Amino acid sequence: MTSNTTAPSTADAHKYGVLFVFAAGVLWSTVGLGIRLIEDAVVWQILLYRSISLSLFLYVLIRVRSGESPFVQIRRIGFPAVVAGLSLVAAYSGGIYAIQNTSVANAMLLFATAPFMAAVLGKIVLREPVRAATWIAIAVAIGGIGIMVADKSGGVALKGSIAALGSAFGFAVFTVALRWGRTGEMLPAVFLSGLFAIVITSAICLGLGLSFVLSPSDGGIAMGMGVFQVGAGLILYTLGSRSLPAAELALLSLAEVLLGPLWVWLFLGETATANTLIGGAVLLAAIAGNALSGKRRKPPPITAP
């Protein structure tokens, strides 16, 4: 009797887990389209507005979900939460700059290297073992990256690619910091990253003489991204990841990478270069191969910048 009632429940949990995680990837994949639709604001102004809405959204969410202040949870996690929060600020900044200065396809594919960077950092910092298959996948991914940046030997596009890799490194540090703090709870650290971003971007805007007032269109898009693109995506991922193994999470995360370039092609007519497509295919093969080769420890999600 017990097995008959448990099996459908487990199957339903898996089904909804797949649905929620895929939906999170769909929301995260809109980051490129959102930034492309912003007309005048620069990276620091976009990040400021997005961080304000994200922080307010997560504060309410954490209070409702846990019944306690996010600051209580941050104190519980300790210094790793600070490291995680600061690393996300770097990741967000690099991500927005990358999308503004290279193709969305190129940026999104390079963001996807974050799990490989996290594996290497985990090995160095936490002495976590790395499977042989992961090392092979990392080598293949490096080859794909080389192909992608081969036609960007100079100029703004190369800076965008470097910023995208820097963003991926920031997300990798975030992942390792949460493992260091022995917590799978990402929301308090993401909330803290929003507060850090507000302070840092406000100071930069003051220093550069940038206006704190954006056009209704730019401000609305940036704040909408904080709630819907980042915040709602986090909720769906948190709900779905509880019932899925790490290998499935890694495969479902590819939805974000694949759909991001699709949106800007459909709505804005933006295309990718041949090098980006070929190198991206190699990179995606490395990610998928690593996921299929065996289950890994379930990592916190790599959120869209």
What is the meaning of each model-derived region?
Residues R63-N106, F111, I147, G226-L244:
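Specific transmembrane alpha-helical segments of multi-pass solute transporters/efflux pumps
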Residues T2-N4, S51, A150, D218, ...:
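C-terminal-most transmembrane helix of multi-pass membrane proteins
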Residues R75, M108-F111, I124-I147, G154-S161, ...:
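Loop-to-transmembrane alpha-helix entry segments
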Residues Q45-L56, L88, I96-R127, S167, ...:
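Specific alpha-helical transmembrane segments that line the substrate/conduction pathway
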Residues T2-L48, L86, G94, G143, ...:
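Glycine-/small-residue-enriched transmembrane alpha-helix faces in small-molecule transporters
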Residues K15-A23, Q45-L61, F79, A137-V140, ...:
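Hydrophobic alpha-helical transmembrane segments of multi-pass integral membrane proteins
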Residues L58, L88, V130-A150, S167-F171, ...:
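Hydrophobic transmembrane alpha-helices of multi-pass small-molecule transport proteins
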Residues A107-T113, L178-I198, V230-L266:
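Helix-helix packing/entry segments at the starts of transmembrane helices
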